[in-house]
Amino acid sequence: MRAGAGAAGESCKDDGVRPDDVSRLTADAVVRRVALLAVHTSPLAQPGTGDAGGMNVYVLQSALHLAKRGIEVEIFTRATASADPPVVRVAPGVLVRNVVAGPFEGLDKYDLPTQLCAFAAGVLRAEAAHEPGHYDIVHSHYWLSGQVGWLARDRWAVPLVHTAHTLAAVKNAALANGDAPEPPLRTVGEQQVVDEADRLIVNTDDEAKQLISIHHADPARIDVVHPGVDLEVFRPGDRQQARTALGLRPEEKVVAFVGRIQPLKAPDIVLRAVAKLPGVRIIVAGGPSGSGLASPDGLAQLADELGIAERVTFLPPQSRTDLARVFHAVDLVAIPSYSESFGLVAVEAQACGTRVVAAAVGGLPVAVRDGVSGTLVSGHDVDQWAAAIDGLLRSNAGAQGALMSRAAAEHAATFSWENTTDALLASYRRAIGDFTAGRRRKVRDPVAARKPRRWTARRGVGA
């Protein structure tokens, strides 16, 4: 398991290829073109709507920053409207390919496995239009993409790097009321992708441990790469100007919840906590998603039941610029999720100098420095959340509030996309070095060359 850049491991020392051979192959690896796979949600979709969230931001921003290093990036995603053009040139060196696979509308994410063959065919056809060896590496995002990624890896003879973003077993262990468990099909599919991937990229050390304990991943194949934040967009700004733009009074205390409105994200916890704090206003920025679609007005109804409807402002999903303005305007951002592989919203808020109160789950203890840039809450007890929010609000006007605000911005600055891109490229080069060494081993061992590539090492997963 590696954090950021590092030397290649020694897994090849008994296979006819010396460790220093792998190190040399890694150092010599050249990344010219990358195929990014994002089957279930487009990087061009507005975060906070449907299935769009932090992963969308991650895929798009990593592609843009790789392109700034002179690397060509093609992102493959499923077309969801007949008006989607086959190819969208997002920026120099970055294009999105909208692959037609299944109906444009009305296809639930849980039905997408039925369309993976069609999606894979579209990906392979796109590559077939180029000269052999067009892509140097495949990077799949989420397990559905990983299923297509390992097929492309074998067809193109290039390494597969995979980022899970979330794991079914982790989500199922922390289900919120009203959320349906992830199906066994996904658990099996995730195990297959973990077994097949040449390298696995995770957001945090905690996620790496989960991959190892749940899916028996090889620690030597895991790279820890923290997501980045756009520090040009998310930076400290004028609070009063932002409040005027949003119609907020200069003196009122304001808490924000930003994200998809679904049980997993627990926006109801914030409303119930704020209901215990007289005079505190809450801004909810986001749209219903997942099981939240079953009751799109549920949060507004809850505000009515709690008697705080006049203190709740609902905003649609925000563009990055508008989201930064929301962060500038509020006193703190609340993130009470039951499960969160990282928590990009937490870092974006802190980059604006806004403190965060977050659940101590998943990657949030990495995204938020407890007692320094914000507060972490263990569990989802409403009284504890009310106390945590009240404590930060009371310190707002004093020296402690200003100190935490500066600390928040300083902490967020360590999560730049430049650092993320450096770590991604290091992982890509390791994957290419290991993959090349593996192919050389096959040439030296004719018996191994006749074996299926990875099937002999596969582990089954019970439902």
From Swiss-Prot:
Which Gene Ontology BP terms does the record give?
mycothiol biosynthetic process
Give positions of region: Disordered.
443-463
List UniProt keywords, sorted A-Z.
Glycosyltransferase, Magnesium, Metal-binding, Transferase
Oligomeric state and interaction partners are given as:
Homodimer.
Give the protein's biological function.
Answer: Catalyzes the transfer of a N-acetyl-glucosamine moiety to 1D-myo-inositol 3-phosphate to produce 1D-myo-inositol 2-acetamido-2-deoxy-glucopyranoside 3-phosphate in the mycothiol biosynthesis pathway.
Its family? Answer: Belongs to the glycosyltransferase group 1 family. MshA subfamily.
**Full protein name:** D-inositol 3-phosphate glycosyltransferase
